Design a protein with these regions (language model features):
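Extended, histidine- and acidic-residue-enriched regions that form the cofactor-binding/catalytic faces
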Residues: 1-114, 118-211
C-alpha cells in the first residue's frame, strides 16, 4: 500500500490486497460515534467525527500498519430522541453491526482491532469485548478516546474540570480545534466560564452527562 492513505473506504481492492499480501497491515481501527443533538452550537456528527479524527491521526502515525475501517456513525442515542435529527440504534443492533464489521476484517486476515469510541452512550459495547474475542478468535479492544486523559489533566486544562460531558467545554474545545466549521455560535447564550449552555433539567435527561 503505497498511497499514504489509511482510510479503508478511500482505497481500491488492489491497494488492500497488495498491502495484506505484503504483510504491511497489522491491525485496524473501527471508529464508533453517533448522529445526535449536541445542543444549539455543535453539529450532530460530533461524536462520530471526533472518533474518526482520533482514529485517522493514530493510523497516520502508524502507517502503513493500521487501517481505519468505515466509521459507525449511528449509535445508542435513545435518550436524545426528543430532539429532532437524532438517530438511534438498539444496543443489540449496534453491537451486532460492530461484530459483523470486526468479523469482516478478521476474514481478510486482520487479527487486531481497536474500537475507538466517541459517544458515551455506546458504552455497553465495551462490555461485549470478551464475547467478541472468544467468538472471533482475535484481539478486539474498546476504548473511548477521552479515556486517554487523566482526571488530573482535565482538571488542570479545563475550567469546568469535566470530560467528556455533553456539548460542553471539552467537546466544544475538541470541535474548535479539529473541525471548527462544525461550531455555530450565532444566537447561542452560554456561561463563558465553562461553556455550560445546558439547563439543569437538560442535564437531568442525559444519563451519561458526567461520563
Amino acid at each position: 500500500m503505497k498511497t499514504g492513505e489509511v482510510r479503508l473506504w478511500k482505497l481500491t481492492r488492489r491497494h488492500v490486497r497488495e498491502a495484506l499480501e505484503a504483510g504491511q497491515i497489522k491491525g485496524a481501527i473501527l471508529p464508533t460515534g453517533s448522529t445526535e443533538q449536541h445542543n444549539e452550537h455543535l453539529a450532530m456528527e460530533h461524536d462520530a467525527a471526533s472518533a474518526l479524527h482520533v482514529s485517522y491521526q493514530a493510523a497516520l502515525e502508524l502507517y502503513p500498519q493500521v487501517l481505519v475501517a468505515t466509521p459507525m456513525n449511528v449509535g445508542i442515542s435513545e435518550h436524545w430522541m426528543e430532539f429532532p435529527g437524532t438517530l438511534t440504534l438498539q444496543a443489540d443492533t449496534f453491537a451486532a453491526v460492530a461484530y459483523e464489521i470486526c468479523d469482516s476484517l478478521r476474514r481478510h486476515g486482520i487479527e487486531k482491532i481497536l474500537i475507538i469510541n466517541g459517544h458515551a452512550g455506546n458504552g455497553p459495547l465495551g462490555q461485549r469485548m470478551d464475547d467478541f474475542r472468544q467468538r472471533l478468535g482475535i484481539e478486539v479492544r474498546f476504548h473511548s478516546y477521552w479515556e486517554a486523559y487523566s482526571k488530573e489533566y482535565i482538571q488542570e486544562h479545563m475550567e469546568s474540570g469535566e470530560a467528556p460531558a455533553h456539548a460542553a467545554e471539552f467537546e466544544t474545545a475538541f470541535a474548535q480545534a479539529a473541525f471548527p466549521e462544525n461550531v455555530h455560535w450565532d444566537g447561542v447564550d452560554y456561561e463563558a466560564a465553562n461553556l455550560d449552555i445546558q439547563s439543569e433539567s437538560y442535564r437531568d435527561r442525559d444519563p451519561v452527562y458526567f461520563r
